[in-house]
Amino acid sequence: MKKMGVALLGLLLLVVFAGAAEAEIKIGVLAKRGPEKAMADWKATGDYLTAKLGEPVVILPLKFVDIEPMVKGGGIDFMLANSAFYVEMEKKYGVKAVATLINSRDGKPLKEFGGVVLVRADSPIQTLADLKGKKFMCVKYSSFGGAQMAWRLLLENGINPQQDFAVFAEGGKHDNVVLAVKNKVMDAGTVRSDTLERMAAEGKINMADFRIIHQVKDDFPFVHSTILYPEWPMAAVAHVEAGKAARLGAALQALTSTDPAAKNAELVGWSSPADYSQVRECLHAINYGAFAK
């Protein structure tokens, strides 16, 4: 009887701990600059949401290739990923945006971002047309700011990245692309806006060592080559109850710029979900993924 009692107690504890694990709210975050950077940026957001919602919220840094399997399999409850991932997961699996992040630059709110086409400052490449036959690196073909925005721009200017480059490589992380261009491994590359400025602020590069191809001159505070698109959304996976999704979205939108969660992620805060129709148009234009003809 004693052994049976111990066994039953063990089973009960297993059930309790399993239930506790299931009760966690799991947010999958696209780790565009690696898992350590993702945790440094977003762990405080998990802590903030835990306090606001009264439920444990955990941050799971994910590689580009991990996002779709985790959404499809229900391994995460919410996803924070680039805008293209969002519209694809929306179309295929019914994820729903609950908030859109508002980036920060010198305290100014930025709800959009763009793509940057960069070369070394001493490169003979001057125009998009000059990129034909050159070695070009993107972050991942699935990276919106680090590939797909520039891909659309190139197609609109008569260059097919899949046919017209000597090499069309993936760097895996934004920093890798910048360093590959800096070290002459690649002739040119593309990353999302604010990558160069952040790397310069971290002492990894000097902005003067690079030149921007097809630079757009406007009041946006980061260099960019493409039109601007809405920032990353936080999205609820289809299995999440609507009330819980709404509460998490409201909690994010209540975040102030002085909170550690905002400071660590370099955000002003969060807004209601943006209009992502321009993102869908981009994926249609490059004939990509769920939007391929």
Residue ranges and their predicted role:
Residues L8-V16:
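Bacterial N-terminal signal peptides
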Residues K26-T50, L110-V178, D194, A262, ...:
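Bilobed "Venus flytrap"/periplasmic-binding protein-like clamshell domains
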Residues L60, V65-S83, E88, K92-Y93, ...:
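Short helices/loops that flank or line small-molecule/ion binding pockets
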Residues V95-L110, V223-S225:
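A structural signal for short loop-to-beta-strand junctions that line the ligand-binding cleft
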